[in-house]
């Protein structure tokens, strides 16, 4: 066999001519010490604050402290897999998470990696975790309701699309239940929901996901979970990741979105832990000086965008856990001052069976009736006043003095309102049904119903109206107002008489 040398020579020459030597320059540092999720790195002279760095075993971190001789890096992963002497290289990019419709129905960690065992998420886009809040010119006033399906809230502490409403209370008062009921109530409305679980037990998150799946709410929801077992940096970054995932739908798809941060107290604790380990000076309650900015830059990203930017919205429901009802502690006062109102939950109301345990007296919505449909405005204003008067009279009546008939009637009606506002968990009411019930109790159409049977009557009333007078509900749903109060009054009188005959 004859070897064609000239052919081989020409191929070799061609290869040599085509050879290019690509020189890649990487800035590399060395881990000096590692522990508690924080690495001190020598080198990386030109690293930027907030830049992502990569350790030699593939774990990522973020440059937090830029000091004279070293860089303080927080580790987004298991720091036990990193050793002294490991090399660390710059990535020249900031922390980004995958975003897009591919994440709907999935459970992810704060880096956007799936943790539900359903395979990879092939998201086509990413967004920076930290992004600026929309400016004044990009916003419009909040005026469209975000229905929670909870009578006490939709009637007296209404939430609008683009609002930030704080849910605050001691542990075990039903804060998460209110947020999850609001997510369930968005079914069929086209609202995209993001539930961010921070520092919770993995078992609690699993049962929440299961509940959302069973109720058919997971298909329009993204769950971002940083459990109590995850490192502090992941718990710190979780709310910002969830917010970025929702922002994609607000900016790119022009949709209404709802984000629940459950809860920001644990995020502040994680941030305090990181700051102290980075040797940043502690302030009040050992929190760092910028803990207000931690929450303000997150919650300012909630907005109702102006029409020329697509009119999308991001509604935020941050949750704060208080200790023994102490709302004047550092983190609660910070978040109260940032948000557009708060829903207070009291443990004594919860214990006495008033659930949801909303204290209407000190809960406020700074958006107010702008976030209600006309039908709800027609019936709810009167109820808030009656309930406030009832609370005053109730304290007076406990003195055991003889009450005149008018005062007694007011007390009885107040008791009926309290009973009517009770609502089991995971059963949100459509707004037209709420309007009918509130109209009935405030206009005296329940005055003959015994207080103990008000809840039973509420169910009977709605079932009867759905079966026999469905046009009443249809008209409220379509016109968003009660167009014929007399007709509604006649229907309610009839139903009340029927109920009293049967019982």
Swiss-Prot record:
Q: Name one Pfam family in it.
A: ATP-synt_ab_C
Functional note: Produces ATP from ADP in the presence of a proton gradient across the membrane. The alpha chain is a regulatory subunit.
Instruction: State the similarity comment.
Output: Belongs to the ATPase alpha/beta chains family.
Which reactions appear under catalytic activity for this entry? ATP + H2O + 4 H(+)(in) = ADP + phosphate + 5 H(+)(out)
What's an example GO cellular component term for this entry?
A: proton-transporting ATP synthase complex
Q: Which InterPro entries does the record cross-reference, listed alphabetically?
A: ATP_synth_asu-like_sf, ATP_synth_asu_C, ATP_synth_asu_C_sf, ATP_synth_F1_a_nt-bd_dom, ATP_synth_F1_asu, ATPase_a/bsu_AS, ATPase_F1/V1/A1_a/bsu_N, ATPase_F1/V1/A1_a/bsu_N_sf
Membrane topology label:
Peripheral membrane protein
Record: residues binding ATP: 169-176
- Write the Enzyme Commission number(s) for this entry: 7.1.2.2
The keyword Zinc-finger is annotated on this UniProt entry: no
Query: Could you give a single Gene Ontology term from the biological process aspect?
Result: proton motive force-driven ATP synthesis
- Designated gene of the protein: atpA
Give the taxonomic lineage as stored in the record.
Answer: Bacteria, Pseudomonadati, Spirochaetota, Spirochaetia, Leptospirales
- Domain of life of the native organism: Bacteria
Q: What GO molecular functions are on record for this protein?
A: ADP binding; ATP binding; proton-transporting ATP synthase activity, rotational mechanism
What Gene3D superfamilies would the database entry show? 2.40.30.20, ATP synthase alpha/beta chain, C-terminal domain, P-loop containing nucleotide triphosphate hydrolases
Query: Which named protein is this?
Result: ATP synthase subunit alpha
Q: Where in the cell is it found?
A: Cell inner membrane
Instruction: State whether it acts alone or in a complex, and with which partners, per the record.
Output: F-type ATPases have 2 components, CF(1) - the catalytic core - and CF(0) - the membrane proton channel. CF(1) has five subunits: alpha(3), beta(3), gamma(1), delta(1), epsilon(1). CF(0) has three main subunits: a(1), b(2) and c(9-12). The alpha and beta chains form an alternating ring which encloses part of the gamma chain. CF(1) is attached to CF(0) by a central stalk formed by the gamma and epsilon chains, while a peripheral stalk is formed by the delta and b chains.
Site annotation Required for activity: residues: 363
Write the record's keywords in alphabetical order, separated by commas: ATP synthesis, ATP-binding, Cell inner membrane, Cell membrane, CF(1), Hydrogen ion transport, Ion transport, Membrane, Nucleotide-binding, Translocase, Transport
């Amino acid at each position: 066999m004859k070897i064609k040398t000239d052919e081989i020579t020409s191929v070799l020459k061609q290869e040599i001519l085509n050879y290019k030597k690509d020189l890649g320059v990487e800035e590399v540092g060395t881990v000096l010490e590692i522990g508690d999720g924080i690495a001190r790195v020598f080198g990386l002279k030109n690293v930027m604050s907030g830049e992502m760095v990569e350790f030699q075993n593939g774990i990522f971190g973020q440059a937090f402290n830029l000091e004279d001789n070293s860089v303080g890096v927080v580790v987004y992963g298991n720091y036990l897999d990193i050793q002294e002497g490991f090399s660390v290289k710059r990535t020249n990019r900031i922390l980004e998470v995958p975003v897009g419709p591919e994440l709907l129905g999935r459970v992810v960690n704060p880096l956007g990696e799936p943790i539900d065992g359903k395979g990879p998420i092939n998201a086509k886009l990413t967004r920076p975790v930290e992004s600026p809040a929309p400016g004044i010119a990009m916003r419009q006033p909040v005026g469209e309701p975000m229905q929670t399906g909870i009578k006490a809230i939709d009637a007296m502490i209404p939430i609008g699309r683009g609002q930030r409403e704080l849910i605050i209370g001691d542990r075990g008062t039903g804060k998460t239940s209110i947020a999850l009921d609001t997510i369930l109530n968005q079914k069929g409305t086209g609202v995209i929901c993001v539930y961010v679980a921070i520092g919770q037990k993995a078992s609690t998150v699993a049962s929440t996901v299961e509940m959302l799946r069973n109720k058919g709410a997971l298909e329009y929801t993204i769950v971002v979970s940083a459990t109590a077992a995850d490192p502090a940096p992941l718990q710190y970054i979780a709310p910002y990741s969830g917010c970025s995932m929702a922002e994609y739908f607000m900016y790119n798809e022009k949709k209404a979105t709802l984000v629940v941060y459950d809860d920001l107290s644990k995020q502040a604790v994680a941030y305090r832990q990181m700051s102290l380990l980075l040797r940043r000076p502690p302030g009040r309650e050992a929190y760092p000086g910028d803990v207000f900015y931690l929450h303000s830059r997150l919650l300012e990203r909630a907005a109702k965008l102006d029409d020329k930017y697509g009119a999308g919205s991001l509604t935020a429901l941050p949750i704060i856990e208080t200790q023994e009802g102490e709302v004047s502690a550092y983190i609660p006062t910070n978040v109260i001052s940032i948000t557009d109102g708060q829903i207070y939950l009291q443990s004594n109301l919860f214990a006495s069976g008033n659930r949801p345990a909303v204290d209407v007296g000190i809960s406020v919505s700074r958006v107010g009736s702008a976030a209600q449909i006309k039908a709800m405005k027609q019936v709810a204003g009167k109820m808030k006043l009656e309930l406030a008067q009832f609370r005053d009279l109730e304290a007076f009546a406990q003195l055991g003095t003889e009450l005149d008939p008018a005062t007694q009637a007011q007390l009885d009606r107040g008791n009926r309102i309290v009973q009517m506002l009770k609502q089991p968990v995971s059963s949100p009411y459509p707004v037209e049904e709420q309007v009918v019930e509130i109209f009935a109790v405030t206009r005296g159409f329940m005055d003959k119903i015994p207080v103990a049977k008000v809840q039973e009557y509420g169910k009977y009333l709605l079932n009867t109206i759905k079966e026999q007078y469905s046009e009443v509900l249809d008209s409220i749903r379509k016109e968003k107002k009660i167009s014929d109060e007399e007709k509604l009054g006649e229907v309610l009188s009839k139903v009340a008489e029927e109920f009293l005959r049967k019982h």
